[in-house]
Amino acid sequence: MKEQKLIHEGLITESLPNGMFRVRLDNEDLILGYISGRIRRSFIRILPGDRVKIEMSRYDSTRGRIIYRLRKKDSND
């Protein structure tokens, strides 16, 4: 049986090496996010200040996989 993933929205605050980012979630948690393979293959640029959807395991709440970059009009701001 596949593990259920939690999906949150957040804001990229810092860019780190090797496709890693510091992400501030909407619930004010600060986690480490890495780019999913689909985003990496599509050459989607993610910069500090972008809003993203991030998928987290329920077992490790300090890391997550960035699965979608929200457009400016898609975000809730």
Swiss-Prot record:
Q: Where in the cell is it found?
A: Plastid, Chloroplast
Molecular function GO labels:
ribosome binding; rRNA binding; translation initiation factor activity
Q: Does the keyword Transport apply?
A: no
**Annotated SUPFAM superfamilies:** Nucleic acid-binding proteins
Q: Please give the GO cellular component terms listed in this UniProt entry.
A: chloroplast; cytosol
| Protein role | One of the essential components for the initiation of protein synthesis. Stabilizes the binding of IF-2 and IF-3 on the 30S subunit to which N-formylmethionyl-tRNA(fMet) subsequently binds. Helps modulate mRNA selection, yielding the 30S pre-initiation complex (PIC). Upon addition of the 50S ribosomal subunit IF-1, IF-2 and IF-3 are released leaving the mature 70S translation initiation complex.
The entry assigns this protein to a family as follows:
Belongs to the IF-1 family.
Output this protein's name. Translation initiation factor IF-1, chloroplastic
